[in-house]
Amino acid sequence: MQFINKFKYKRKGHRIIKAFIKDKWNNDIQRYVNLNYNELKRIKAFKYLLLKEQQGFCCYCMRKIPFNEVTLEHVMPHHLEDKKRKEEVKYYSKFGRLKRGKIYYCPDKEIPISPKLHTPPYPHCIAHENLVASCQGKVFEGGEKYILHKCCNNFRGNDKIVPLFFIPRAAEIVRYEIDGTLTYFEKYESTISSLNLMHSTLIFMRKIWAKIVINNISLNQVNKALTDNDIRINIIDDIDTVSYTHLRAHETRGNL
């Protein structure tokens, strides 16, 4: 897992969010119209920025994300139960740039329609600091088609997690083994489980990554494998995995 540096692109992120907020102000009626998360996630420039921050990788499983498959993840969940709100806002404020003074808890329904917002801080549901790019949770579980929402963003829901990507030592905290499994401290078990990062599809993908590194397979070979099925199969042919015919043909193409 990689560290996501939200400070590096802070100015660009704030510029997009400020422009979004300004655009939603209606001077005629002196109020905001459609100032909400669903409108923000339509802005392509914002998605591109999040992908750039993450070098194109999913914040959780580290697969490359095609732009049309990007989902936006609220690190501090969009909606918190009233009885847990105070505790969880305090909890998430310890990570990254989720500190008070930069963002504040405010789901869509609580964003005031007037007067104009003075930012920063930003409502957490539309704050650059609180949003990262995730995949669709696409995995293979047999049959002809992949299943969505089986890991990462949508699988998590509103579960309380440790946002590991906001810890500078993230790559050391969660380590990839050559057999595709993950090793991590026991205190992160619930986070890994909430994200389903030990799903068999993800384990298989990590085996492939390990083989590429261990066998010094060149970038040129990897790029050729994207369009050449024979090369792709040759790269993964000695992995001891059963019943991955469809996975070999499809999933590895986008993630080698």
Residues covered by each model-derived region:
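Histidine-centered nuclease catalytic patch
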Residues: 63-150, 155-156
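Conserved small/polar residues in nucleotide/adenosyl-binding loops
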Residues: 245-252
